[in-house]
């Protein structure tokens, strides 16, 4: 780590990159690390011991609680809430109004050549859809997509796409998340996605820099 790229904030005990850019209303807790090439919007609030890795992009009105990390290029949309101890891994997009509960582990994008140089290079993007709720202690495999308005139950293992929006998923009868029921439009938990809403995407420059082997 090039500590010359950081400034030490003595009051909070945090290391913050000199090129860090943020909007108005930014707040952070104690002992945070914000790496180079991180950009956050307005009214972003970080808890204690939060680590944002290079390539992280955070939009407006986002709360990231204590002991959370990003591990690389990632995008958190507006009005997202990430609760204590969650890991937003490299190549994860969290769309607007998503709630990520405590202790979520999203798997790193695939490019499994760490020990096998001849292995095919392939990088995948994971998506948590608009208004989805990801229950505590959920694990997600690389490259899965969770539909808008989906509710994923506690301790679920998401190994395939959860394709039906406004539906409940959890580990029953298998040890991975499967469809349990759909949510009625008159239910308070039903999420209406605005017709004008466009799911977030990584821009081309970020993809070229951090995910050169990603192919849509």
Task: Enumerate the language-model features and the residues they cover.
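Short secondary-structure capping/turn segments at boundaries of alpha-helices and beta-strands
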Residues: 12, 29-31
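Glycine-rich hexapeptide-repeat left-handed beta-helix
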Residues: 1-21, 66-67, 75, 81-216
């Amino acid at each position: 780590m090039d500590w010359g790229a950081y400034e030490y904030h003595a009051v909070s005990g945090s290391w913050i990159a000199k090129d860090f850019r943020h909007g108005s209303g930014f707040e952070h807790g104690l002992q945070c690390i914000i790496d180079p090439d991180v950009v956050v919007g307005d009214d972003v609030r970080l808890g204690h011991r939060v680590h944002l890795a290079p390539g992280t992009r955070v939009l407006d009105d986002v709360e990231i609680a204590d002991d959370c990390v990003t591990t690389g290029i990632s995008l958190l949309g507006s009005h997202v809430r990430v609760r204590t101890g969650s890991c937003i891994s490299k190549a994860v997009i969290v769309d607007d109004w998503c709630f990520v509960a405590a202790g979520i582990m999203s798997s790193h994008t695939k490019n499994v050549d760490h020990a096998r140089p001849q292995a095919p290079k392939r990088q995948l993007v994971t998506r948590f859809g608009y208004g989805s709720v990801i229950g505590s202690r959920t694990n997600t495999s690389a490259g899965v997509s969770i539909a808008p308005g989906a509710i994923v139950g506690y301790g679920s293992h998401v190994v395939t796409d959860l394709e039906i929006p406004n539906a409940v998923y959890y580990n029953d009868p298998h040890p991975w998340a499967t469809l349990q029921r759909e949510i009625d439009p008159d239910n308070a938990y039903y999420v209406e996605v605005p017709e004008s809403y466009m799911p977030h995407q990584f821009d081309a420059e970020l993809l070229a820099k951090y995910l050169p082997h990603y192919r849509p």
